[in-house]
Amino acid sequence: GRLDATNAVGVPDVTVITKIGYDHMAVLGNTLAEIAAEKTGIIKKGTSLVLESQEAEVMTVFEAKVREEGITDFRLIDPLEIKEQTYRDGRQYFSFGAYRDLSMRMLGVHQYENAIAALLGAEAFFRRHTEWICGGTKEREEGVRRAVCQGIAKTVWKGRMEILSKKPFLLVDGAHNSNGVEALRE
C-alpha cells in the first residue's frame, strides 16, 4: 500500500492485490474503505493490476484509483469463473479460463483466487516482456505458462491450512485476522 517499502522501487510492472480485510488497523484505518485507500497507494500509472474480488465498499475505492491513475491493463478475478473445484488426494483441482485441471497443495477455497492472482500476475508480466522471456515464440510462451502452473502445483505454505496428521486429524493454521479465520472456517 501507500506505506509499503516496495513503493521505493518506482512503478512496478504488475501489482497484485489480494482480499482486503481488517488487519494492521492501527496503521491502515478502521473501516474496509480506509484500509483499501491505504492499499491503493501501491497502484501507479503504467502498471498492470490484478485484483481479487472484494467487498463493494472496497471495490468503490479501487475503481476510483484505477480511473485516477488511468490503469488500462486491469483484471478483476470473478470467483464465478473458477470451475470444476474438487479435492482429492490432498490437492485442490480447478479450472479457470483457458487453464484446465490446475492443481495445488495449498488448501482452502480462498487459495483458488490466490492461485489465479498469481497466474494472472504472471500473464500480465509476460505480456510486457514476452520477447525477453519467450524469445517471441508461441512454444516458449506456452512453456513459461506451464512452468507457472507447475510452480503453483508445487507451492507449499507451512502453517497455513496444513494437515499434519489424518489420524488423529490435526490441522495447523496461522490465521491472525478475520479474513484468515473466515477462510479457515470455510
Predicted segments, located by residue:
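Nucleotide phosphate-binding/pyrophosphate-handling subdomain across enzymes
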Residues: 3-16, 20-21, 34, 98-186
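Acidic, Mg2+-coordinating active-site environments of NTP-dependent enzymes
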Residues: 12, 16-102, 115, 119-134, ...
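Glycine/threonine-rich flexible loop motifs
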Residues: 2-6, 26-29
